[in-house]
């Protein structure tokens, strides 16, 4: 992904904004599921869904049992709405792509109910490094 400066201000019709969020969420039962093919699949799915909603992925890492994302979400969209949409759509797409997963996850619930979110502010570089070093 191309590097973007930390202090870039985006704009909408009558708004200037710089909203960045560190978001972490995990599969149901914190299962270690993201290896090889499923790791690549969820990465592509999350990129696709973010693109649909105009959300920029600044940094991201798919760990075996959770996902870290540093996102730039426009202020016209609430964080809770977007995370719900992201988890819901990605869940459906994972079950569609990997049909055998429905036996491991009852009621087709792929993700845990909650998530972690933190506003990033001026320490974007530190959060980017933290996410990039998750697998070390």
Mark where each language-model region is.
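Basic nucleic-acid-binding interfaces
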Residues: 1-136
């Amino acid at each position: 992904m191309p590097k973007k400066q930390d202090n870039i201000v985006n704009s909408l019709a009558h708004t200037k904004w710089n909203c960045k969020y560190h978001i972490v969420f995990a599969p149901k039962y914190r299962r270690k599921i993201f290896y090889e093919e499923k790791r690549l699949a969820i990465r592509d799915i999350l990129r696709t869904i973010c693109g649909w909603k105009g959300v920029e992925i600044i940094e991201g890492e798919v760990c075996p049992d959770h996902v870290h994302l540093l996102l730039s979400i426009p202020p016209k969209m609430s964080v809770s709405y977007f995370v719900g949409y992201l988890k819901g759509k990605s869940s459906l797409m994972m079950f569609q792509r990997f049909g055998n997963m429905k036996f491991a996850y009852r009621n087709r619930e792929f993700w845990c109910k909650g998530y972690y979110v933190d506003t990033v502010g001026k320490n974007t570089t530190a959060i980017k490094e933290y996410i990039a070093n998750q697998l070390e």
